[in-house]
Amino acid sequence: MADIDPARPLTEPPAERARAIPRGRMALLFAVMLTTAAGNTAMQSVMPSIGTSLGVDDVWISLAYSWSALLWVVCAPFWARKSDQRGRKAMMALGMLGFIASFVLCGLILWLGLAGIFPALWCLLLFAAARSLYGGFGSAAPPAVQAYVASRTPRAERTQALSLIASSFGLGTVIGPALAPFMVLPVVGLAGPFLVFALIGAITLVAVRWRLPNDEPQFPARGTAYESPHSGSPPNEVGKDESDEDDAVGAEPGKLRWFEPRLRPWVVSGLLGGHAQAMVLGIAGFLVLDRLGLRGDPAAGAGPVGLVLMAGAIATLLAQWGLIPRLDLGPRAAS
């Protein structure tokens, strides 16, 4: 029997640990999440000014983009399951196409409406229809990104990798309102942020199609449905249970019910917290316009509204990146 080298570990580390996702690919996944969140929160920062310019009551503006959030809630679990069947890259591409199409159409519709070509009512109805593309198809990208990372990352490194992806979502809620005032362009006016973020989304889509390889998962994982990105709200994952990481290879995941006993406390807390956050965001922009007396000059309100939304998002990121790690408030152990 050969002598055992005491300096050599008795068990070799698994080969998968050397196959972490390369930084270039991780940057692409980061960009997909960042673009999705930043574009949506940029829209939220200019819509109060657009609604005032169109002469539409505040409540109808809030309902117009709340409709897409409702579609996101309904469609995201469906796309999460599809990403397990059709591949993560395909669902990312579909989600980015939905994002691009929605923002291009919304930008053109609002541009024509602000120019007086469309009546305010038709402009609002067409805007809500175009936003349906974002809620219906844009919701395919975040679950696919999460599943791509989970399926290609060993369990020991999975939490860190998924935290990075979650931080991109949160960072987008800061960047979107910060950039929106600078995207109010001379020709298209307040519709500028829609068209600029559509261009950014197109660049991201090309990079994903060109640089991201077709996914062949090394580890079992299932798609997870992210909630619609709102300014200042962390990206909660809908329908994820800690036992998902321990699923056997090849096992067919069962379809989770809305009131699954294991998830009921998280669903209720997410429902209450999400509604509270959405109500604040629904009135924050209009409140800023009223308090600053900018109803007569709505274009000047994009900057202050964006600043308020950005401040709320920064507060959330400070808790997510600073307070939670400092207090060691990690997730419960999977075992």
Q: Positions of the model-derived regions?
A:
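Helix-loop boundary and gating motifs at the non-cytosolic
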Residues: 19-69, 265, 269, 274-295
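C-terminal ends and interior cores of transmembrane alpha-helices
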Residues: 97-120
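Juxtamembrane intracellular "pre-TM" segments in multi-pass secondary transporters
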Residues: 2-23, 213-269
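Hydrophobic core of transmembrane alpha-helices in multi-pass small-molecule transporters
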Residues: 34, 116-140
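Helix-to-loop junctions at the C-terminal end of transmembrane segments
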Residues: 75-88, 318-332
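Cytoplasmic helix-loop-helix junction between adjacent transmembrane helices
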Residues: 130-169
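Residue-level signature of mid-helix packing/kink "hotspots" within the transmembrane helices
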Residues: 69-77, 173-174, 313-321
